[in-house]
Structures are given as structure tokens and as C-alpha cells.
Amino acid sequence: VITRFAPSPTGVLHVGGARTALFNYLYARQHEGNFLLRIEDTDKERSKKEYEENIINGLAWLGISYDKLYRQSERADKHKDCLQRLINRGLAYEAEEGKDGSGKVIRFRNPGAKISFHDAIRGNIEFDTTELGDFVVAKNIDTPLFHLAVVVDDFEMGVTQVIRGEDHISNTPRQILLQSAIDAPHPTYAHIPLILAHDKSKLSKRHGSVSLVEFRDKGYLPDAMVNFLALIGWHPEGSGELFSMNDLVKEFTLERVQKGGAIFNIEKLDWLNREYLKKMLPEEFEKKVIEYIPEKFKKSDKKISERMLKNIALIIVERINTLSDISAMFESGEFDYIFERPTYDPRKLLWKGTPDLLVTKQRLDKVIELLQEIDEENLTGDTVKETVWKYASSEGRGDVLWPMRFALSGKEKSPDPFVLVSILGKEESLKRLRYASETLIARNS
């Protein structure tokens, strides 16, 4: 088995191309075959090196490795030789082009045969090729065009399966005619469904991000992206939705690829990415947190300690879809309380229906007393909860935990007070609780 992914370097790698590459890769690896990357760069005006690099880097990011790389432009002599043989045999000829006949092209002499082929996804497909006429295969002897170059390359590279988008179905009869003309075997074709937007139109830039690099830069994980791409149009046998690359190599079959268009569901991608973020080892996720924290929060006066980082990571992983959400959380001021002691109106320390400042102060003082008993080395959200919970339950959880949380963060919405203590540390937490107690005295006097 030999499959190939054959992109043109006239733009960046988009999700549709990435999925095509993935399906070809999975099929080849499952059958212990080879997966080829063929850069179809014969359009000299539009092909650019940076787009080729983008394609190669995108595949590498996804973990899709190819067995050999070809550039179509480096095979021009082989295309030219084949074209000349077709002309010599009378199977192609030079023809005038344009109304004034000033231009010349080379056309394939179409025998007008009826063609049928079995598509591994769509079943039998038939074409009456008389409708195609004598189609153009080259601008001139030195410039063969798409159909001829593809047929020659697939033949010489031994490609056995052509897995590509359904928009290529109309190309297939021309390519089968050319294969017969050069005595090349017909590969097995499998035309996968187009990727559609939520409105069921073809996915495009107007629907948002479509290039692979945009999703990478937004902080989606490659494993999540691979999992997501595989599920666009392919349906596994069981009910499971989480698949590693190794799982996909074992499970993927063309028979379970749907014929109709497949919807690009960004909510599904976000869900998958969250699942993969949660599966990361804590130390790996902590490295990602550091990577995505804005630079201004890494200065010496705002430096996050290792303990802080571990506890912040526990909060963040439950609340983000992508890694770039980490930057947004810091930039929005959500974690400002970590770096600066909050200031606030003391009345906000009061829980619902608790007008008595003195009672609230007494409860904060008791929390201070309890926290002093905890060894700094054993300070975790769990140990803080164990220490405070019994007292909070006896007094009324809201009456104790609300002023404790607000004193630590100055925010009505923040992590629970046990986690806050574990982030801020014992010393800083006690300072903030004492400050809150003092403001209540001042307010009461």
C-alpha cells in the first residue's frame, strides 16, 4: 500500500488538507505501507517556499510523518518524456488555442469511452467521457499540466490508493483515460466528503479560522486536533470519542467514512481540547501555563512561585478551552489578586443577611487562628479545607467562607478560599485576613 498527500504550495495548510493528509497517513500505517508527501509546485507564479514550509511544519505538528518527500517541479523531465511519447503515438496533439489561433496547447485525443470505477467510499461511479472532448494536458511540450503530472507521478511512485476530497471526483475520468494511455494501473480511489461550516456551506475563511497554524497559535493541542480531524466524516464503531494516533491507526477504515458533507463543529473541538488538557501530566501543563502567562507577569516583582504555579494550574485546567485562554485570563485581571493585595469596601465582607460587622470579624479571627496551626510545608487546598470546614459548618458555611474568600481575593467570583490560601501561601493569606479584620474594626468604630 502506498498513499500520498499532494498539496499545492499556493497557500497555508488548512483543516481540509490536514484531514486528507491524516486519512492517507492512517490508511498507509494501518496496512504497513508508505505515506508520501508530494508538493505539487508546478504553478511557478503562485507556488511559494514559505507555503511549502507551512505544510511540512503543519504535518509535523500533528505528528504525521511521511516516508518520502517529492516536489513535482523536480520531475518535469519525466512529465515531458511521457507527453512526448503520447504525441509520438498519436494520443496527444498540438492544437490552436484562442479565437485568433495565436496560441498553442497540447490536447489529449479522447477515445470517448464510458468509464466506471469503484470508489471505496461512494461505490461505483460512471462517466461518459465523450462530454469531456479532447482536453488540454499541457501548455506546451515543456509545461505539462495538472492531470498529466498527477498520473505520471502516481504511476512512477507506485501509488495504490488515492484518498482525496470529493471535489476531485470530476478529475478522475480524465486521469483514468491518461492512465490507460500510458499503460499505468488504476489506483483505488476514495473521495472523502467536504468539510462544511455550521450553515452547511463549504468551510471558508468567512466562517473563522481554517488554517492549521491558526488553531496551533490559539493553543489547541496537536493530539486534540488529530482526534477532531479524524472524526470529521469518519465514524468509529463504538461510542468512544477520544482516540490517540495509535488508536486511529488501528480503528480507521474507509468503509466508515460518510458520503455526505461533514460539519466542522468548533464546540466539539473545544470539548476535545479540554479533555486532552486534563489528561496532561501536571508538570507538562505547568510548563504550558508558564509559556502562556504574559511577560509582564513574569517580572521579578510579580514572579510566581513554584507552589503558586502548581495551584494556579489546578484552577486553570478546569476553566479553559485552549492554552491561549490562559493569557486572556491574566490580561483580563482575573489573577491580579495574586500579585496585589486587594482593597475593598468592608461591607462586602458581609455574607447575606449578616449586618453585624463584629460577628464577621470574630469569624475571620477564628479562621486566622485555625490557619496558624497548619504547617507551611503541608499547605494544600485539602489541608486548609480540613482545618476550616468543621468550624464553617457549625457557624454557617457562607457566614465563614464568604468573608474568608473575599478577604483573600477582593472578588465576588474567584476560586474557593481553600485554593486561594494554597496559592497565596500561609503568610500572605494571614496578612490579608488580618487586614480584613482590621477594616471591620475601623468600619465599626
Locate predicted features.
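Active-site cores that bind ATP or allylic diphosphates and position pyrophosphate for catalysis
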Residues: 72, 88-205, 211-215, 236, ...
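Charged substrate- and nucleic-acid-binding regions of tRNA-handling and nucleotidyl-transfer enzymes
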Residues: 375-440
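Conserved phosphate-binding loops in nucleotide/dinucleotide-binding enzymes
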Residues: 139, 157-168, 196-228, 232-241, ...
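Glycine-rich phosphate/pyrophosphate-binding loops
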Residues: 29-41, 149-161, 182-196, 415-420, ...
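N-terminal Rossmann-like or analogous alpha/beta NTP/dinucleotide-binding catalytic cores
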Residues: 1-97, 171-184
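Short, basic, low-complexity termini and linkers enriched in Ser/Thr/Gly/Pro
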Residues: 441-445
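Small-residue-rich helix-loop
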Residues: 282, 286-393
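Residue-level signal for inorganic ion chemistry
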Residues: 24, 55, 86, 108, ...
